[in-house]
Amino acid sequence: MKKLGKLLLGLISLVATIAAAFLVWIQCSWDRDHDAHPTPQLKASTDPAVIKQGEYVVRALAHCGDCHSPKGSEGQASDAAPQMVGGRVFDVPVFGKFISPNITPEHATGVGAWTDEELARVLRTGVSRDGHMRPFMATIAPMADEDLVAVISYLRTLPGARGATVDDQPTLIGKFVIKGMEPDRRAAPPYVPAGGVSVERGRYLALGPANCAGCHSASSPQSGLLPEAPYLAGALEPMLDETDPSMEFAPPNLTPDKDTGHIYNWDEDGFVARFKAGRVYKGSHMPWESFGRMTEEDVRSIYRFLRALPPTHRELGPTRRPRGYAKPS
């Protein structure tokens, strides 16, 4: 018995030592340096047409203010210049708290001291100026060089304002996930300019700047939190209703599956009307205020792309339901 007791104590001690070593390893190495990752050689433009294009991408398609405004989408409801000073807190269960940064050209707390190339890198790959990963930025969809230059050009015209200086607060699990993340190496997609209605423009928007696939597809730490195929078949994990913690939202299946496709029975005019109608639930994660600024041509293009997708059968249940809802088997 004494030998067995010593053996058990030895095993417990070994496990504790390994666990402690693992914790120290994560704490000391989670914030990896990716500064060697290539920086896109892109420069901002002062061309008014390019700046106007950037304003449309920032304020409508890419819904940047949904994260980089303290009030999220609510702060983007007016036509006034957006207050991109950051400070919005994203409390992600299990993974920690993440605070959006100031992206105005203010030097002390914003991106005024950043080069155009550094801005291009964080927007395209998620690698920040200091070489470290910005987890949320690493998951935004890639956009063509033309739109990326336009975004940077527009951001340079915003009034500089002091903003958030609080660091992210990832949990140990969050640090472990961030440690495993790699810079986004997806190639920039071919540019499909605005003008007219087409499936090609809809594909570019839904998988690019508008990032429909980012919320309406499954993702996991194994995929680097990037969308997993089949794209746009709905998210497997719900999102909490920030205004009512007893409720949650399930980003629905947008493929044309006749049984589980959320918009299967919608016609094109109905799809456009829904975007014009705006927010129904205050706590919805859908950036209705920003998407309400999209041109009708772009909304119709997205609809036509969604209708051209292969149907995927994925039953997700109600889009808004009590927290912890049991999915149909």
Feature annotation, model-predicted:
Residues 13-16, 20-23, 138-203, 301-305:
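Extended surface/linker regions that mediate inter-domain or inter-protein docking
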Residues 84-118, 139-148, 230-274, 288-299:
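Electron-transfer interface patches adjacent to heme c in soluble/periplasmic c-type cytochromes
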